[in-house]
């Protein structure tokens, strides 16, 4: 194992200057096998007193500080211009929002902007329950893990366990951000919705730190992002939670936000997927925010519903955009984790009356 590790290091992109090998004579040890002792030679050519690389003269390529500033600024501003009028805005980059973005981004013609108020996307999906590491995923959502290439322990017939929730979150986030049609705006908060003629048409944004300090500062007007579809995946109630549906109630587009009920895992996950829908024209609600608007039970530290709800929201958005989708069967190949009954659960008559 030591030889393999050393060989991998020597073949890596580690950018030091390799020193000459300091090969020592093989050592001899006596090994007892229960019978006559035998002598085994151990090579020490890999492990020497000198390190394999010398970094005393290491040097990066030179760069001007202004170039760094210009690269960051130009690219970010280009993204803001591109997504000032975009196809889909996803509000919240938790497990449901990222799953939605992953599914949407498979269509390279759909431009997707993800707005996340935290510096670090992922929501509550970096850990399991009570700050533990493992992520429990009920079947058949494990098929989504298979699609992503996330390893898991086949713990039982009904569920699987990912050894650390961060494995899922980092994998799906990396896959999403690698797609050229997706941009993540983290540390950006959504302060309001754009509504025209009874239809949600985008979001009102601001730097998250500015949003948190409106009471102490003035003259901090927001920015806007127009979108053909807004997907609200803001999570359950809290300081920054369920903000999409709460704003709909404030402006009279829905009657009430009853809040989620007490925990019932079996009822909750099915309900969240089944009730993921376009709640008002132009706005789809996914993830735990669904439980808030429908008074469904909370589900606790299981994550399968977040993944499938996010995927379903993506196909509802594709339908709204007039693109091939799984809801009306116009897409030839669907992620195997999307069960037919979950897709069929989304009906036009589920739209909440304004």
UniProtKB/Swiss-Prot annotation:
Transmembrane segments: none annotated. The modification 2,3-didehydroalanine (Cys) is found at residue 219. GO terms for molecular function: cysteine-dependent adenosine diphosphate thiazole synthase activity; iron ion binding. It comes from the Eukaryota. During the catalytic reaction, a sulfide is transferred from Cys-219 to a reaction intermediate, generating a dehydroalanine residue. Disulfide bonds: none annotated. The keyword NAD applies. InterPro entries: FAD/NAD-bd_sf, Sti35, Thi4_fam. It is found in: Plastid, Chloroplast. Residues 1-43 form a transit peptide. Signal peptide: none annotated. One of its GO terms (biological process) is thiazole biosynthetic process. Involved in biosynthesis of the thiamine precursor thiazole. Catalyzes the conversion of NAD and glycine to adenosine diphosphate 5-(2-hydroxyethyl)-4-methylthiazole-2-carboxylic acid (ADT), an adenylated thiazole intermediate. The reaction includes an iron-dependent sulfide transfer from a conserved cysteine residue of the protein to a thiazole intermediate. The enzyme can only undergo a single turnover, which suggests it is a suicide enzyme. May have additional roles in adaptation to various stress conditions and in DNA damage tolerance. Homooctamer. This is Thiamine thiazole synthase 1, chloroplastic. It comes from Sorghum bicolor (Sorghum).
């Amino acid at each position: 194992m030591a030889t393999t590790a050393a060989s991998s290091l020597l073949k890596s992109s580690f950018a030091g200057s390799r020193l000459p090998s300091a090969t020592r004579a093989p050592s001899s040890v006596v090994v007892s096998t229960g019978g006559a002792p035998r002598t085994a030679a151990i090579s020490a050519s890999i492990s020497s007193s000198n390190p394999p690389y010398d970094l005393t003269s290491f040097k990066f390529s030179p760069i001007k500080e202004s170039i760094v500033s210009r690269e960051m600024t130009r690219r970010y501003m280009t993204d803001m211009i591109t997504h000032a009028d975009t196809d889909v805005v996803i509000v919240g980059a938790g497990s449901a929002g990222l799953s939605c973005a992953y599914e949407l981004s498979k269509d390279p013609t759909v431009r997707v902007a993800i707005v996340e108020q935290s510096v670090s996307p992922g929501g509550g999906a970096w850990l399991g329950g009570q700050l533990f590491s493992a992520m429990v995923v009920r079947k058949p959502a494990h098929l989504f893990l298979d699609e992503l290439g996330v390893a898991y322990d086949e713990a039982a017939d009904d569920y699987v366990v990912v050894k650390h929730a961060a494995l899922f979150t980092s994998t799906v986030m990396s896959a999403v951000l690698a797609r050229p049609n997706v941009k993540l705006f983290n540390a950006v908060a959504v302060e309001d919705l754009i509504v025209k003629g009874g239809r949600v048409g985008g979001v009102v944004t601001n730097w998250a730190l500015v949003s948190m300090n409106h009471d102490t500062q003035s003259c901090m007007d927001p920015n806007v992002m127009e979108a053909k579809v807004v997907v609200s995946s803001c999570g359950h109630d809290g300081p920054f939670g369920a903000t999409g549906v709460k704003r709909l109630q404030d402006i009279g587009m829905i009657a009430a936000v009853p809040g989620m009920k007490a925990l019932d895992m079996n009822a909750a996950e099915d309900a969240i997927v089944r009730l993921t829908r376009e709640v008002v024209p132009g706005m789809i609600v996914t993830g735990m925010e669904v439980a808030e608007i429908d008074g469904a039970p909370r589900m606790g530290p299981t994550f399968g519903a977040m993944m499938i709800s996010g995927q379903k929201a993506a196909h509802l958005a594709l339908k709204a955009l007039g693109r091939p989708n799984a809801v009306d069967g116009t897409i030839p190949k669907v992620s195997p984790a999307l069960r037919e009954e979950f897709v069929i659960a989304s009906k036009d008559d589920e739209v909440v009356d304004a």
